[in-house]
């Protein structure tokens, strides 16, 4: 019984669910000198003098650097984290500077577990490792060597963390959106939106009594029922030139703010959406796109994979390990943005490898024989072309050297190998960054069964539907776990924490994430034609 009480107490300390005192009186101007000092210390571990903060752990072990950054453990939201049995408590100002009280059914006041922190008690906690009750903090909590000015800055900064619910949340409803393009086929957009509509309809029907429970929740179940909100998903359809998309997104957002953007189908041009998401601090979660933005500066966009770049990185990795004996020729389409991105990525990844790399566009190949350029390198030829263009080149009368290896990206070509001649097929390997099609039925059995039950299954768009369903499930579970703390940063942190343990992985054999990672799948197969018009894996699932 004592162990159960200790576990419940730890959960309360972490989540801060039962805090009943008045709001903190510390109002901070974002951008003030104190705020700037505190932000540098909290997010980078940098003191006002520009030096890295220093501390000790376990009594006398000196440490410094990244491991002392407050944000690493307490996170961007200030809402804390867990790792195994280790609980890092929430330190956002509206929790830290209030008493922590345990729930009770007996008025007038619940018992105080921990008094509100003051400047003095917080200094004791940070410097000496003593909490507001005078008890020792966890030995893993660093004992920092900071001065009063740094503490004032830290107090100012944490007072700005997770203060009010993020936009898109009302007392009754939580608003989301999904993004599609008018240039997508009607079938593709409809397949995605059918999943969104069916999921939200079922979710709201299944929880139709939750509104009453939220209004009249018993004291010991308030944590469960009070956070309930109905879901509403808005469709943001982008039209016309990419340069106008951000303006269109701003107009949609001004009309109805959303808590997060879920999935969406934007094959190319996602950079415009990403810039909008970052500018407005909106989580944009698991879009289906071949051109995600790959930048350490981006925080709010989380992707399924790295798109065309991932297959180019996979090609580079495989060439270095298995095909480094010869040179590499890349064949690309100068009119195709994806083709150019993949081309440049492979060039960059092989730049210092000692492997000779040449490139030829389709325009150049009209004047040069495919065989003549293949004999120059005696190694590997990589095609960044769609199926029609690739087949036209490979199925010409040109005889290619038997020693030549041909790598084809399945994102460009697809997985239908009926048109690849058998004699050439022996030399062809496919770069494939999702599950092999023959194994997808097993992997997608849960989502496909649900689509069929809802009468929305579209075999032609099953990957689009599977990704949409995955994104909805992840967001649904994450919203449940934030338990009424509707802060966007906290939502992202929950997603980062739970991805590894999900039973459903969409079209990928495995997914994983860690704090500040933004791509759930980073692996690939090398595959070959199976002789039946499809592909089969040639290697195990690998990481670049």
Language model features with spans:
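Extracytosolic ligand-binding ectodomains
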Residues: 159-544
């Amino acid at each position: 019984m004592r162990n159960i009480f200790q576990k419940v107490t730890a959960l309360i300390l972490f989540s801060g669910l039962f805090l009943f005192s008045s709001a903190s009186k510390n109002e901070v101007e974002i951008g003030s000198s104190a705020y700037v000092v505190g932000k540098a210390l909290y997010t980078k571990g940098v003191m006002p003098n520009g030096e890295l903060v220093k501390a000790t752990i376990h009594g006398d072990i000196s440490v410094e650097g990244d491991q002392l950054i407050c944000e690493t453990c307490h996170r961007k939201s200030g809402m804390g984290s867990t790792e195994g049995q280790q609980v890092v408590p929430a330190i956002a100002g509206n929790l830290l500077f209030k008493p922590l009280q345990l729930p009770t059914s007996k008025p007038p006041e619940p018992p105080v577990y921990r008094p509100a922190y003051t400047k003095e008690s917080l200094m004791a906690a940070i410097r000496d490792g003593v909490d507001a009750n005078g008890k020792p903090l966890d030995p893993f909590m660093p004992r920092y060597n900071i001065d009063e000015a740094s503490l004032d800055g830290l107090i100012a900064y944490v007072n700005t963390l997770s203060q009010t619910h993020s936009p898109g949340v009302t007392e009754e409803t939580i608003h989301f959106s999904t993004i599609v393009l008018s240039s997508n086929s009607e079938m593709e957009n409809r397949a995605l939106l059918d999943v969104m509509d069916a999921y939200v309809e079922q979710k709201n029907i299944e929880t139709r009594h939750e509104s009453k429970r939220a209004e009249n929740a018993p004291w010991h179940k308030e944590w469960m029922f009070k956070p309930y909100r109905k879901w509403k998903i808005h469709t943001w359809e982008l039209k016309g030139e990419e340069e106008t998309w951000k303006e269109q997104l701003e107009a949609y957002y001004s009309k109805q703010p959303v808590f997060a953007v879920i999935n969406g189908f934007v094959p190319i041009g996602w950079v415009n959406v990403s810039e909008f998401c970052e500018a407005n601090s909106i989580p944009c979660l698991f879009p289906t796109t071949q051109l995600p933005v790959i930048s350490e500066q981006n925080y709010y966009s989380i992707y399924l994979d790295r798109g065309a770049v991932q297959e180019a990185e996979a090609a580079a990795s495989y060439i270095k390990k298995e095909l480094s004996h010869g040179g590499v020729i890349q064949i690309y389409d100068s009119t195709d943005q994806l083709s150019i991105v993949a081309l440049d990525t492979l060039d960059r990844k092989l730049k210092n490898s000692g492997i000779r790399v040449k490139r030829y566009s389709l325009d150049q190949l009209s004047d040069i024989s495919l065989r003549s350029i293949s004999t120059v390198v005696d190694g590997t030829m990589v095609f960044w072309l769609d199926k029609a263009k690739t087949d036209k080149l490979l199925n010409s009368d040109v005889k290619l050297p038997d020693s030549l290896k041909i790598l084809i990206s399945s994102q460009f070509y697809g997985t239908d190998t009926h048109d690849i001649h058998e004699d050439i097929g022996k030399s062809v390997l496919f770069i494939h960054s999702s599950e092999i099609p023959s194994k997808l039925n097993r992997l997608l059995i849960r989502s496909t069964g649900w689509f069929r039950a809802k009468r929305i299954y579209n075999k032609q768009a099953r990957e689009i539907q599977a990704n949409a369903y995955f994104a909805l499930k992840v967001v649904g579970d994450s919203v449940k776990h934030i338990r009424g703390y509707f802060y966007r940063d906290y939502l992202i942190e929950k997603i980062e924490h739970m991805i590894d343990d999900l039973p459903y992985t969409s079209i990928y054999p495995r997914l994983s994430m860690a704090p500040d990672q933004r791509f759930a799948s980073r692996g690939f197969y090398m595959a070959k034609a199976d002789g039946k018009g499809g592909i089969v894996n040639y290697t195990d699932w690998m990481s670049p």
